[in-house]
Amino acid sequence: MGAVPSTPRWGGSSSAARPLDTAEYLISTFIGDESFPISSDFWHKLLELPLNLQWPPHRVHDACQSLARNNYHTRHLAKILIHMAWCLQESISTSSGAPSLVYVKAVNAVYISSVFLKYFIENEKGDKIEDLYLSLDESEPIPTDITKDLNIEEFVMRSVLSFIGSIDVSPDTYLLHLELLNFMLIAMSTQLLSGPSPGPEDVNPFIDAAMSQESSLVILVVRKLLLSYITGPSISLNSASYSIYSEGSQPGVLQRVSSAAANLMLLPFNFLVSSSGEGSRSLLADCSLHVLLILSHYRKCVVGNEPITDISNDTTASDSLLKGSTHFSDNPYCKALEHATDVEFDRVDTEGNAHAGPVLRIPFASLFDALGMYLADEAAALLLYSLLQGNADFLEYVLVRTDLDTLLMPILEALYNAPKRSSNQIYMLLIILLILSQDSSFNASIHKLIVPSVPWYKERLLHQTSLGSLMVITLIRTVQYNLSKLRDVYLHTTCLATLANMAPHVHRLSAYASQRLVSLFDMLSRKYNKLAEMRDNQMQLVKGNSIEGNGLADDTSTEMHIYTDFLRLVLEILNAILTYALPRNPEVIYAIMHRQEVFQPFRNHPRFNELLENIYTVLDFFNSRMDAHNVDGEWSVEKVLQVIIINCRSWRGEGMKMFTQLRFTYEQESHPEEFFIPYLWQLVLSR
C-alpha cells in the first residue's frame, strides 16, 4: 500500500520504495486518512516493531497535525487507546516469566498514545475535549469482546490502573511502568484547560474515569505508587528505551491555553513523554509521586440536590447561587491516603480497631525515612503535608518517633535557604512545622534532641545545639527574610504561631536563640516606629485636605495594626516562656536583661502594657538580685549567668499575671484545590 495523500512527505532517498512494515511507514499510515478497522492486522504490525526513529521536533509536530486532521474520520486515537488497554490486560495475564512480545506491544502502544494525546490536549480549542473523538464510528465492525457503547477512557484507565496496581516493578517491567505514569500525567493534564477552581462545566475524561474505579483497585494503585516512591527503583534504560524525538527534544509547547491555572504558572506545557531523562533520584519514583499527588488532590465539581459536604464558605452573592447547588464528589485516592495504616501496627491490631472495607497498609517507617531523605524536593514536602494534615495515624506515628531530626533537619535547611526556594515550598514547610507544633510532646522532645553541628548554617558555628533551639533560630531568620523580601503577612503569622505553640515547652534555649528572640522584638519595633512616624506625617497632609494623604494614612494605619499584632505575639511568646518555663531558660532571662531597653518605649502602650508588666516583674526580680551581689570589676557574661541560674531556683512567679496559653492550630482553607492544582502542575511541568 502506497503512502496516502494526506501523509506528510518525510523526505529521504527511496521513500517511494519504502517497505510496508517499517516503523516509518506504519507511523505514516497511522496518521493518514485511511481508517483501519480496530481488528485489522495493521495494529499488530504497528505495535510489534521497535520504534527507534529519530525524528526532529518539526516532523513529530507535523505527524501530530496530520492525525488531528484525520482523526474524526479514522478514529485512530481511540483505536490505539483500545489496543493499549488490550495489551495491558494481556500483559497482566502473562506477567510471569521473561518479557514477551506483549510487553513490547504494550510499551509501543502507551508511548504512541502519549505522544499524540499530548498534542491533542495542548491544542484543544476551548474545552472541547470531545474533539479527541474517544469513540468508534457507528459503521465500525466491533469485535465480540467489546460493546458498541464502550466508554473508552473508562476502559483505558481501568487497564492502566490495573497494571500499575497488580504488576510489580522489575527490570522487565520498569519501562512499561514508567511509560504508563507518563501517559497518566498527560491524560490528566486536561485540568490545565480549566481554571484553578474546578467548575461543573469542566471536562476531564481520563482523571474522572480514574475516580470511578472500585475502592479495592484504588488502594492497590495508591499502595504501588507509594512503594515506588519509597524504594525509588532506578534501572538503566539505555538499549531498552527509545524516543522518536531526536536528542530527547519536544514537539512543541502549549500554544494556547485559556486557563487560569496555566497562566498562573507561566510555564510552557513542555512535559517530557520521552523515556530518557533523569529525576532527582529515580525517574519512576518522581513520576509515581506526581501521579499520586494529582490523583489525591483532584476535585470533581458536580451539580446535585444531595446534601453539600464540601463547598465554599464564601458569602459573596456571585458565588452563592452557583455553589449553593454544586459540591465536590468524594475522591477515593484522597480517602485511601487519609485512612492508610502502618503495616507494623496492623499486625498487632486489635479486633475492635478493625476498619470496615479494604484499607491501605504501608510501611510508615520506610515512608518516614524516604520523606526525610528527599524533603528538599517540593513534591515530597507536599506528600508529607498531605499525610500530616489528613492522616491522623501517620501524624501520630511521626510524633512518637525519637529521631524527629530526620524530618526537621531538611525542613530547617530548606527554610534557611529560602532565597533559593519557591514561596509555595516555604509555605508548605512552615505549615508542616505548625501542624507538628500543635502537639505538646513534640514541643518538649525537640529540646531533648541535640544536634552535634549544623554545617549549612553559615552565620555562626552551631555546636551541640538542641533541635528546638535550631528551630527557633530558623523560624526567626525566616521572619527576618520575609520582612525584607517577601513581606507576606501569612508567612509572618505562621512562623510566629509556631513559635507561640513551642514557647511553654521551651527547655534550655540556647544563648543564640534567646538573643534572636529578643532581637526579633527589636526589629519589629523599629519597623513599627517607622510606620508610626510615617502615619504622623501623613496625618499632617490630611489636615491640609489632601485626598492622597488621607489614602496613604489609611494604608499606613492598616500596616501599623498588623505590626502591632506581631509585636504583641512576640511578647506573648516571651511571656509564655517566662510563665511556664523560666527556671529552665536562664539564657532567655539573660537576653531580656541584656536588651531590656528595647521594651521601655512600649511600656505604656495599651496593647502591650499587661504583657510588659510580667516582663518587668522578671527584670525587677533579677536586677535586684544582681544589685545585691558585689562584684569586683565588670560583670562578665559568665558571672551574670551564674547569678541568674542561682536565683532561678528561688523564683516563685510572684506578681506574674497568668494569661491564657496561646495555642494555634492549622485549618486548611475551604478551597485548597485553588492552591494545590496549579502548584502540582507547576511541579510536574518544571521537572
Model-derived regions, located:
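Acidic, Ser/Thr-rich intrinsically disordered and amphipathic helical segments
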Residues: Y25, H76, H83, N108-V115, ...
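Alpha-helical repeat/alpha-solenoid scaffolds of the HEAT/ARM/MIF4G superfamily
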Residues: I31, S35-I38, H44-L51, D62-C64, ...
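Eukaryotic scaffolding regions of large macromolecular assemblies
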Residues: K420-R687
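Short amphipathic alpha-helical segments and their helix-coil junctions
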Residues: L77-G97, R158-S166, A260-S274, L408-L415, ...
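N-terminal alpha-helical scaffolding segments that mark the starts
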Residues: G2-V110, F120-K125, L641-R687
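Long alpha-helical rod scaffolds of large eukaryotic non-enzymatic complex subunits
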Residues: A3-P5, S35, L81, I92-S95, ...
